[in-house]
Amino acid sequence: MSEGSAIEVNGRRYAPPRAPVVVVCVDGCEPDYLDCAVEHGAMSWLGAARAAGTSLVGDCVMPSFTNPNNLSIVTGAPPSVHGISGNYFWDPQAGVEVMMNDPKYLRAETLLARLAAAGATVAVVTAKDKLRRLLGHGLKGICFSSEKADETTETEHGIADALRFVGRPLPSVYSANLSEFVFAAGVRLMETRRPDVMYLSTTDYVQHKHAPGTPAADAFYRMMDGYLARLDALGAIIVLTADHGMNAKTDAAGRPRVVYLQDFLDAWLGEGRARVILPITDPYVVHHGALGSFATIYLPADTRVDDVIERLARLPGMEAVLDRKEGCRRFELPEDRVGDVIVVSERATVVGTSVARHDLSGLDAPLRSHGGLSEQRVPVVLNRRTRVTPGARVRNFDAFDLALNRVV
């Protein structure tokens, strides 16, 4: 990529990288995780980086789930532009509920692909393979997941035998090791190939189980701090942000606080007449039992939307109940990929479909989850000083703009 040749992607201009840029999306990283870890002496590098560089708290996009936010970060745009409205949605053309992992659902090009096309060397490492195809869409470069690092080929992933390259065993998808593999791979890539731009995306296994400041959480962030320090020592401009925060979703006794919307609507409108979609749904339900703080509802044609909104808003634990138009305007969502009604529950409450459809037997700790406005605040930290307008709203998808355009 020639020096001075800026590129434009989704309405934003980006300068070419002046030094290796590493954007890290720490899944489920409520800002308190960093604050507690620094206070407890677990993140000495981050503490110094926040003091000498840039330390902000910004907003993620809604719903506060993995797919919409990772794609917002790599496109520099909200879901209304890139089209990824959740991890899961109702595809009206196919008439089925589907995982939103196929690049065919992506409506915008990624900055990563454009940078690579302009001649930059680009690498992507993600914890879960569900994100890999979306993040790597159109990308000429390295793109693989920790989850399937034993299956990589030069043709499909830009690197053969990533497991041997990183020098670590294949991690369990339900472990902190899945994220550590991402960091280890990032350091190894920077040491050996020194990409111009690298995107690292972890999993929130630890955050779903452990609150900020607990020993397990601090241990995770201590591990992360060590790898970030090594990337810094290698000369990288580092941006640390998150796809969403995380909160306890329990009552005073530690039991999940759930409002089952499908059961409620079936009892009122008739069984199966309304369809509740939970965009948190993904293949890894042990994390959260497919329970989050955001839902979208498709209603039968003869139903008055205003009546449904009014009754849902009276349910305990509701923060916002909006019609499609207002919800998509407020949350910057594509109207054709959400239902007639959008439901957001408050900080300590999640929404489900039916009691019978949620298996919570895999939860071995009090439920912690995300999806709502209460999980929208995320850290935005750089190891460089930046030009940021005081008081301006910062979004997690400003990460590449900050690293490429605003470093002093």
Feature-to-residue mapping (PLM):
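Active-site-proximal N-terminal segment of extracellular/periplasmic enzymes that hydrolyze or transfer
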Residues: M1-T54
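Beta-strand elements within well-structured catalytic alpha/beta cores of enzymes
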Residues: P16-L34, A49, I73, L115, ...
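Secreted, luminal/periplasmic, and some membrane-associated catalytic domains
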Residues: P17-A19, V26, S64-F65, F89-D102, ...
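Short catalytic/ligand-binding loop motif for oxyanion handling, primarily in non-cytosolic enzymes
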Residues: P31-Y33, T66, H82, K130-G136, ...
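Short, structured active-site-proximal loop/turn typified by the sulfatase FGly-forming signature C/S-X-P-X-R
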Residues: D35-P79, A123
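Short secondary-structure boundary/capping segments
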Residues: E39-G41, G138-G141, G213-A216, A253-V259, ...
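His/Asp/Glu-rich, glycine-adjacent segments
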Residues: V74-A211, A217, H287-G289, S293, ...
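Low-complexity, glycine/alanine/valine/leucine- and proline-rich hydrophobic stretches
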Residues: S345-N405
